[in-house]
């Protein structure tokens, strides 16, 4: 992860707290080797992929207007994740799939996709409360929260949700969306 953020869990107080100190935490460089991810379990891989998508969606579903470049960057990275995730899950030692997922994860977490956008991290805050109390992997908790969150988002910005469906998931474009 290339962000300036971290999360600390305090087990005896059932608290999970985020800290943001980019000047200290953001790495200056990283050596990324997809082969080092081959032994990750399917569960951890899927949870990481879910977290990547969540980080991008929390930037993508912005109330900020006129950010087509950011939107297209988000859509491109999400589309790559959608394409590569099944390959990573079915072929855990596929170097190219792992490399693409690794790069997508870096971009998802380093803020590149959200430049100029108002961001909404409420879903992450909700998940932190869940995983502070229960033994839940972060990405798995987000997988539970995001369908409801997306339903909520559709009520407030149906056009953006339709755009997401068409551009990321290849749902046929329709005036009925």
What is each of the regions a protein language model found here?
Residues 1-69, 163:
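A glycine/threonine-rich phosphate-anchoring loop and its flanking beta-alpha core
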Residues 59-177:
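Active-site segments that bind and position negatively charged phosphate/pyrophosphate groups
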């Amino acid at each position: 992860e290339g962000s300036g953020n971290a999360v600390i869990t305090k087990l005896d107080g059932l608290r999970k707290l985020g800290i943001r100190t980019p000047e200290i935490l953001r790495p200056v460089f990283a050596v990324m080797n997809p082969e080092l991810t081959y032994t990750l379990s399917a569960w951890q891989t899927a949870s990481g992929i879910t977290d990547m998508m969540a980080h991008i969606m929390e930037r993508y579903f912005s109330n900020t207007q006129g950010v087509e470049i950011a939107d297209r960057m988000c859509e491109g990275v999400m589309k790559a994740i959608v394409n590569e995730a099944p390959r990573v899950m079915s072929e855990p030692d596929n170097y190219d799939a792992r490399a693409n997922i690794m790069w997508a994860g870096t971009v998802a977490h380093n803020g590149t996709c959200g430049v100029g956008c108002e961001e909404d991290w409420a879903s992450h805050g909700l998940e932190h409360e869940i995983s502070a109390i229960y033994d839940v992997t972060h990405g798995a908790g987000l997988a539970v929260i995001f369908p409801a969150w997306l339903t909520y988002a559709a009520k407030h910005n149906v056009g953006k949700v339709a755009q997401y469906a068409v551009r990321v998931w290849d749902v046929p474009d329709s005036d009925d969306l």
